[in-house]
Structure formats: C-alpha cells, structure tokens
Amino acid sequence: MYIVIVDTGCANLTSIKVAINNLGYNATITSESSIILKSNKIFLPGVGTASAVMDLLSKKKIINVIRECKQTILGICLGMQLFCASSEESNGVKTIGIIKTPALRLKVNNLSLPHIGWNQITFQKGHALFKNIPNNSRFYFVHSYMVPINKYTLSTTNYGINFSSIIQKDNFFGVQFHPEKSGNIGSQLLKNFLEI
C-alpha cells in the first residue's frame, strides 16, 4: 500500500508518520501532486491557520488534486475543517469545499479556548472506522474551530456545544482530534482507516 501524508507545513507531520510506521506501514510526506495521485491512502494533517494551509496548498497547486482524488483520504484536525466550504477564521477563508458546511469558531461560554485535552466521541451507528473502538472512547483534541453537526457527521463531541468529531463524505474522512496523539485508541482508528 502506498500512503502519502500531504506536506501542509505543519508541525505534526512526523508524529503522524511515526504512528503509521508503528502500525507496520510506510508513509511518504510530500506536496508533489504526481506522488499524491499515485497513492492508495492520503492523510491531510493540519495545525495552525486555515489561511496559511490553504495558501500553501494553492502555491503547490494541490487543492484540485485533493478535491478530485478518488483515494480514501483522512483530514486530521484542521485538515478535517479544510473539507468544509469555508472557515470563519480570519474573517472568512474559502476552503476545499467537499462539504457545504462552514467551519465555525467554537462558542463555549466560560470554557477556555482552544479546546485542549482528552474528550469522548459518541457515535450513533457502527462503521468500519469504529472497529474495536468502544463508543464514548476518549481522544486528544486541540482546536478553536469546529465542523457543525451535519448529514456527514459520524460522531459527535461536546465542549460547550455538540460538534462533529468525525465526518465522512464518500472517500473523504475527517477527524477533529489527533489520533497520532491519542495512544492505543488513536492507533486503532488509524489502523481501521488504513484497512478501509
């Protein structure tokens, strides 16, 4: 299996690569469209701002490569938010647009932002991504923006409000949390994704 991690210039690229290696797979970090197109599985990580990552993807001319890919792709944290039509960040940023829902700033009343730490995900029905993962398992989150609950939501999490913690539309999967920082349960989710 040929696995690619899209080089979004963010800090968690190596930790994702190590997590994949620990499952017995090799992954290539790249922003070359020809290499991305040859892959079987794609990871789209993101840490930082939507505008910075979209600028980088635009400069590398890989926005349409991602938008039109037929391979199974997993957006992680900001990577999931980039699948939305836009982000509220920086007074509005146009993103990749796989789903029409916008990514919104978390409104958490008296809770602190960003949302940092372990929190549970709740899913309503079985899915191959949840194999050997008990409902209400806890994953590690670091974010200030979220994807509202929509028809592509597979699991939800509550931090002041309920939001999508996992989405799927066709071959596009997204997780708001960091599976590579979520211990054994995160490794299981990565394994499940690679086996879909």
Swiss-Prot record:
The active site is at 77 (nucleophile), 178, 180. Pathway: Amino-acid biosynthesis; L-histidine biosynthesis; L-histidine from 5-phospho-alpha-D-ribose 1-diphosphate: step 5/9. It catalyses: 5-[(5-phospho-1-deoxy-D-ribulos-1-ylimino)methylamino]-1-(5-phospho-beta-D-ribosyl)imidazole-4-carboxamide + L-glutamine = D-erythro-1-(imidazol-4-yl)glycerol 3-phosphate + 5-amino-1-(5-phospho-beta-D-ribosyl)imidazole-4-carboxamide + L-glutamate + H(+); L-glutamine + H2O = L-glutamate + NH4(+). Its main location: cytoplasm. GO terms for cellular component: cytoplasm. Residues 2-196 form the Glutamine amidotransferase type-1 domain. One of its GO terms (biological process) is L-histidine biosynthetic process. Disulfide bonds: none annotated. Coiled coil: none annotated. Heterodimer of HisH and HisF. This is Imidazole glycerol phosphate synthase subunit HisH. It comes from Buchnera aphidicola subsp. Acyrthosiphon pisum (strain APS) (Acyrthosiphon pisum symbiotic bacterium).
